[in-house]
């Protein structure tokens, strides 16, 4: 791909700055500007949108987002070695790129972006799932983001879109499908990255729902689902007994069989259970309905 921003190819950039991916930070650099541009386009129309990017590394996706017309990109990078590279991109797009040398897990990210907001990221593998759960469980409806376009390990992506009855169905599927409409929109082989990881990767696009598919409180639902799948081979009455002494009665009240296992329960069933558990699990600020 011929760069339209006047900056060198990414392989030249990392060579000039002596950059190499660090396993401790979960880094795998995506250096093909054709691929980073495609991921940016998968996020949809970016004009008049502020974008949060986590883990930009040498800035390939950052360049794609800006080239696609993002109103503003806030790039959160924990690795100080990448800051000089990102500063070069910032100089090409004055006023449109803000780089934060910070840990995304400790950041109040929404304060730095104006609505509408989208999150687009090649997430570091070691924090991707934790960040996703945080983005999926704010107290507000709709969430502070319009969409998420995120790269994960392929097995994580498959867990996000999994359906009841499958071995990959669990917490990520329930929270993702309660808050959004998630779809796998792109796959990438290991050789697309430097260094190549041992697994395939996939991009998942989440379109935020204006209201939950079924009424439930985010914190209560998260607790119930975590307990149920924490011992997924056990019957619900055993897996959830630590939440309430009368758990069998509550399961029946939610329309569930106490002898079912977590992987058999659809999203609607978990939301019904969360509602009947609100008096024993401290809810978040106000019930989400």
UniProtKB/Swiss-Prot annotation:
Enzyme class per UniProt: transferase
Keywords: Cytoplasm, Methyltransferase, RNA-binding, rRNA processing, S-adenosyl-L-methionine, Transferase
Recorded coiled-coil stretches: none
Reaction(s) the record says it catalyses: adenosine(1518)/adenosine(1519) in 16S rRNA + 4 S-adenosyl-L-methionine = N(6)-dimethyladenosine(1518)/N(6)-dimethyladenosine(1519) in 16S rRNA + 4 S-adenosyl-L-homocysteine + 4 H(+)
GO molecular function: 16S rRNA (adenine(1518)-N(6)/adenine(1519)-N(6))-dimethyltransferase activity; RNA binding
SMART domains in the cross-refs: rADc
One Pfam family named in its UniProt record: RrnaAD
Cellular compartments per GO CC: cytosol
Biological role: Specifically dimethylates two adjacent adenosines (A1518 and A1519) in the loop of a conserved hairpin near the 3'-end of 16S rRNA in the 30S particle. May play a critical role in biogenesis of 30S subunits.
Protein family per UniProt: Belongs to the class I-like SAM-binding methyltransferase superfamily. rRNA adenine N(6)-methyltransferase family. RsmA subfamily.
HAMAP family associated with the record: 16SrRNA_methyltr_A
Name recorded for this polypeptide: Ribosomal RNA small subunit methyltransferase A
Gene: rsmA
């Amino acid at each position: 791909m011929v760069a339209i921003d006047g900056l060198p190819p990414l392989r030249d950039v990392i060579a000039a700055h002596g950059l190499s991916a660090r396993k401790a930070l979960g880094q795998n650099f995506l250096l093909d500007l054709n691929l980073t541009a495609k991921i940016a386009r998968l996020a949809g129309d970016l004009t008049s949108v502020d974008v949060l990017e986590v883990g930009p590394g040498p800035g390939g996706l950052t360049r794609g987002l800006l080239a696609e017309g993002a109103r503003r990109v806030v790039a959160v990078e924990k690795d100080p070695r990448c800051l000089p590279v990102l500063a070069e991109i910032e100089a090409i797009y004055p006023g449109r790129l803000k780089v934060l040398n910070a840990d995304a897990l400790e950041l109040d990210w929404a304060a730095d972006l104006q609505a509408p907001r989208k999150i687009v990221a090649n997430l570091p593998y070691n924090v991707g799932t934790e960040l996703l759960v945080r983005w999926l469980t704010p107290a507000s409806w709709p969430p502070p983001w319009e969409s998420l376009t995120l790269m994960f390990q392929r097995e994580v992506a498959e867990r996000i879109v999994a359906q009841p009855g499958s071995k990959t169905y669990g917490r990520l599927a329930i929270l993702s499908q309660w808050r959004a409409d998630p779809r796998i929109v792109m796959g990438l082989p290991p050789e697309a990255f430097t260094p190549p990881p041992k697994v395939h990767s996939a991009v998942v696009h989440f379109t935020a729902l204006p209201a939950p598919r079924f009424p439930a409180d985010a914190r209560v639902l998260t607790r119930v689902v975590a307990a149920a799948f924490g011992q997924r081979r056990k019957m619900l009455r055993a897996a959830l007994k630590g939440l309430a002494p009368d758990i069998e009665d509550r399961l029946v009240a939610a329309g569930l069989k106490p002898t079912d296992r977590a992987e058999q329960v659809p999203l609607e069933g978990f939301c019904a259970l969360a509602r009947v558990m609100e008096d024993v699990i401290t809810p978040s600020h106000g019930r989400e309905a």
